[in-house]
C-alpha cells in the first residue's frame, strides 16, 4: 500500500504544551505554515502555505483515501491540525504513528533521541527550536519590530528558507526511522487499539465550566485572605516572598536554612511564639496548589466545553500503559468527602465561606472536587467501571499461586485471605478493622514485586501502626505464603539473563517468552504483544556479587541512560502490561457494543451513556468476559452510575 510521510509547521497563539493540540487548533489565528511530504521513497517536497502555495490535488485526495497510509512522528498532531486547517474528516485507522512504533521498541519518545539511538545518517536539524520560536509562536511587540505580535516570512526571508529545510529534514528523519524499525511491525490489534485511542481523545470529555471557574475564584479569595492575614501579622509588603519572610523570621530569633515544606514543619515544632506559629501555618497554606488541575482544564478547554487529548497511547514505555496528559487524569486526588453533592453545590453557588465553615481547609475541598469537574454530555450519565484487584489477579495467574486464584474465584477478599495464609488463622476470624487485615493489606500492596522492608515503609506500614522491628518478619511470612510468586521472580530474571547471554528464546508458562533480536530483549506477553528492553547488557552487580541485567531507557531525570533491572521489576512490568492488555481488549469490546468511552484511568473505564438505559450490568459483564489468551484468569468488574466523575 502507498505511504504518505508528513511533517507540518504551524502557528497558533495558544500554548501547545499547556493546552494540547485540540485547543491549539481552535485558536482563531491557527494555521498550517508549511506542509512537507513524500510518497513512499520519493524526494521530499514542501508546500509553502503561508506564502500562498496550495496543496497538490493528489495529496488532498491521499489524505482521505483508504488506499494510502499516512505516517508522521506524533501523528495525532499532524492529523488533528490537517483536519482542522483543511476541514477534512481524517480517520485514525488510515494513519500510523512512528513515535508510538519507536516507543514499543524501547526507544526514546522524541524524534531527535530515536535518530541518535539508531545512529541514523539523517539527524534532526538542531536549529529547529529557534526557528519554531520565531515563526510558530507570537512574538513580543517592541519598538525594533514595529510593535508586531507575530513574525511572518517577509520579516526574515533567510530564516524562512531555513525553516523550510528544517521541515523537509523532519520528514527525512521520520521516514528513515520508519524504514529502520519496519521489520518489527506492531500487532494489527495494537494498531486498532491506537485508532480507538485516537477516537477517544478526539471525543474528549465534557467539563463543568461553572465548577472550574468557581474553584479558581474560591482559591483566589482564600489566598487573598491568607496574604492579608500574613501582612497584618508580619507587616511585610509581600509575606509570600521567601526572602522577606526569612528575614522576618530571623528577626524573631529563628535560624533559617530553608523554607521548604519539611523545614517549615520543623520550625513550627521549635517555636513557642504564637504569631510566628500562625505565620508559618499561613505559609504552608499559601504553598498548597489545589487549583493546578482546574487551571489545566481551563487552558485545554475547547469551545464546546470539552477537553481532549488527555491520554497518551503507550505513554509508559516499560508496560505499554497509557500516560496522562494536560490534566493528568491518572493522578487525581481520591474522594474523602462523603457528601460531594453539597460541596459541589456550595462551590457553584459561590458560597465560599460556607465551604470553609463546613469542611475546613479550602484547598482540601477544592482538591476533593477535581474529579467531579468531569461530567457527562447533555442528557447522559457516566458509567464508571473498573477491574477488581486486577494486578493481584494477574500475578496469581501468571505465577500459578493456586490459593490466591481460589480466593478470586470465590469471596475475593485478598487482604483477609493473605493475612490468614501468612499467620495461619481462619479467614473468618479476620474482620475489617483487625490488625491482621491491616498487615495483610500493606503486605499485598508492597511485597508482590520483590519489595522488602523498605517497600513496606514506603507503602506507609509505620503510619498504619506497625513497628519497624516486625517488618522483616512480615516480609518473610508473605514470601512463605506465596512461594510460587517468589519462584516466578527468580524464573523471570533467569530467563531474561539466559536470553541475552545465549541469544536463544526462553519460554515460561502462559506463552511468556524471552528473546533477543537486533540488540533488543523482547518479552512476549500472553497476549502476543512484546515488551522491549533496548541494548541489554549483563553486568556485575557488586551489591549482590552476581550477574545483573541492564538496558537503555529513560532515567528519572528524563535523560536517556542505562538502567538496572531484576526479577521483581521485570515481573511488575509483565503484570502491569498484561493488565493493560486486559483493559485494551475490554475497551475494544465496549466500543463494539456501542459504548462511548471518554476516559480510562489505570484499570477503569468511564463511559458516556444516554440517561436511563440501565445497562451497567451489561458493561460489568463485558468487562468480566473471559479472554482467549488468558484461560483461567478470573476477571470481575464493579461499576456505578453517576452524574459526575468520582471514586466510589
Curated annotation (Swiss-Prot):
InterPro entries: DNA-dir_DNA_pol_A_CS, DNA-dir_DNA_pol_A_palm_dom, DNA/RNA_pol_sf, DNA_polymerase_A. It comes from the Viruses. Disulfide bonds: none annotated. It catalyses: DNA(n) + a 2'-deoxyribonucleoside 5'-triphosphate = DNA(n+1) + diphosphate. Keywords: DNA replication, DNA-binding, DNA-directed DNA polymerase, Exonuclease, Hydrolase, Nuclease, Nucleotidyltransferase, Transferase, Viral DNA replication. Its EC number is 2.7.7.7, 3.1.11.-. GO terms for molecular function: DNA binding; DNA-directed DNA polymerase activity; exonuclease activity. One of its GO terms (biological process) is viral DNA genome replication. Replicates the viral genomic DNA. This polymerase possesses two enzymatic activities: DNA synthesis (polymerase) and an exonucleolytic activity that degrades single-stranded DNA in the 3'-5' direction. Belongs to the DNA polymerase type-A family. This is DNA polymerase. It comes from Bacillus phage SP02 (Bacteriophage SP02). The gene is L.
Amino acid at each position: 500500500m502507498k505511504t504518505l510521510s508528513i511533517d507540518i509547521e504551524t502557528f497558533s497563539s495558544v500554548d501547545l504544551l499547556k493546552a494540547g493540540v485540540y485547543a491549539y487548533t481552535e485558536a482563531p489565528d491557527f494555521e498550517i505554515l508549511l506542509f512537507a511530504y513524500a510518497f513512499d521513497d520519493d524526494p521530499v517536497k514542501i508546500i509553502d502555505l503561508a506564502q500562498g502555495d496550495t496543496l497538490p490535488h493528489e495529496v488532498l485526495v491521499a489524505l482521505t483515501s483508504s488506499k494510502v497510509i499516512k505516517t508522521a512522528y506524533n501523528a495525532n498532531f499532524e492529523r488533528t491540525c490537517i483536519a482542522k486547517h483543511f476541514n477534512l474528516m481524517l480517520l485514525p485507522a488510515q494513519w500510523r504513528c512512528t513515535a508510538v512504533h519507536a516507543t514499543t521498541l524501547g526507544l526514546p519518545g522524541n524524534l531527535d533521541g530515536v535518530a541518535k539511538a539508531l545512529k541514523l545518517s539523517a539527524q534532526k536539524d538542531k536549529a529547529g527550536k529557534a526557528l519554531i520560536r520565531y515563526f510558530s509562536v507570537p512574538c513580543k511587540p517592541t519598538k525594533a519590530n514595529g510593535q508586531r505580535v507575530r513574525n511572518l516570512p517577509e520579516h526574515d526571508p533567510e530564516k524562512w528558507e531555513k525553516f523550510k529545510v528544517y521541515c523537509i529534514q523532519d520528514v527525512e528523519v521520520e521516514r528513515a526511522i520508519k524504514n529502520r524499525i519496519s521489520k518489527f511491525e506492531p500487532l494489527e490489534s495494537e494498531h486498532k487499539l491506537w485508532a480507538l485511542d485516537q477516537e477517544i481523545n478526539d471525543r474528549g470529555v465534557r467539563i463543568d465550566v461553572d465548577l472550574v471557574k468557581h474553584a479558581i475564584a474560591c482559591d483566589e479569595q482564600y489566598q487573598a485572605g491568607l496574604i492579608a492575614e500574613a501582612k497584618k501579622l508580619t507587616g511585610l509588603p509581600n509575606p509570600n516572598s521567601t526572602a522577606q519572610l526569612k528575614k522576618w523570621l530571623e528577626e524573631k530569633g529563628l535560624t533559617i536554612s530553608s523554607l521548604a515544606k519539611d523545614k517549615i514543619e520543623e520550625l513550627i515544632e521549635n517555636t513557642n511564639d504564637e504569631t510566628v506559629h500562625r505565620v508559618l501555618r499561613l505559609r504552608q497554606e499559601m504553598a498548597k496548589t489545589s487549583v493546578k488541575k482546574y487551571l489545566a482544564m481551563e487552558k485545554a478547554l475547547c469551545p464546546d466545553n470539552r477537553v481532549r487529548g488527555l491520554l497518551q497511547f503507550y505513554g509508559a514505555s516499560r508496560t505499554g500503559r497509557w500516560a496522562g496528559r494536560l490534566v493528568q487524569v491518572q493522578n487525581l486526588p481520591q474522594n474523602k468527602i462523603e457528601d460531594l453533592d453539597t460541596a459541589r453545590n456550595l462551590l457553584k453557588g459561590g458560597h465560599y465561606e460556607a465551604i470553609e465553615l463546613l469542611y475546613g481547609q479550602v484547598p482540601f475541598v477544592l482538591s476533593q472536587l477535581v474529579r467531579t469537574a468531569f461530567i457527562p454530555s447533555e442528557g447522559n450519565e457516566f458509567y464508571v467501571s473498573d477491574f477488581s484487584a486486577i494486578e493481584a489477579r494477574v500475578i496469581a495467574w501468571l505465577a500459578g499461586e493456586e490459593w490466591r486464584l481460589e480466593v478470586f474465584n470465590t469471596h475475593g477478599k485478598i487482604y483477609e485471605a493473605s493475612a490468614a495464609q501468612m499467620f495461619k488463622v481462619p479467614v473468618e476470624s479476620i474482620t475489617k478493622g483487625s490488625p491482621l487485615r491491616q498487615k495483610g493489606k500493606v503486605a499485598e500492596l508492597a511485597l508482590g514485586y520483590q519489595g522488602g522492608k523498605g517497600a513496606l515503609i514506603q507503602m506507609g506500614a509505620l503510619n498504619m501502626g506497625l513497628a519497624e522491628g516486625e517488618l522483616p518478619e512480615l516480609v518473610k511470612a508473605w514470601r512463605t505464603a506465596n512461594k510460587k510468586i517468589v519462584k516466578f521472580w527468580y524464573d523471570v530474571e533467569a530467563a531474561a539473563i539466559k536470553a541475552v547471554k545465549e541469544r536463544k528464546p526462553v519460554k515460561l508458562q502462559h506463552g511468556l517468552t524471552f528473546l533477543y533480536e537486533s540488540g533488543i530483549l523482547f518479552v512476549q506477553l500472553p497476549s502476543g504483544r512484546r515488551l522491549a528492553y533496548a541494548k541489554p547488557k549483563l553486568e556485575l552487580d557488586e551489591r549482590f556479587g552476581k550477574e545483573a541485567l541492564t538496558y537503555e531507557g529513560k532515567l528519572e531525570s528524563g535523560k536517556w541512560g542505562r538502567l538496572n533491572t531484576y526479577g521483581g521489576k521485570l515481573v511488575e512490568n509483565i503484570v502491569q502490561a498484561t493488565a493493560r492488555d486486559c483493559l485494551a481488549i475490554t475497551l475494544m469490546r465496549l466500543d463494539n457494543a456501542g459504548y462511548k468511552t471518554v476516559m480510562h484511568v489505570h484499570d477503569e473505564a468511564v463511559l458516556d451513556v444516554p440517561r436511563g438505559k440501565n445497562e451497567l450490568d451489561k458493561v460489568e459483564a463485558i468487562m468480566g468476559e473471559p479472554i482467549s489468551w488468558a484461560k483461567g484468569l478470573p476477571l470481575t468488574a464493579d461499576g456505578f452510575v453517576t452524574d459526575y466523575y468520582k471514586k466510589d
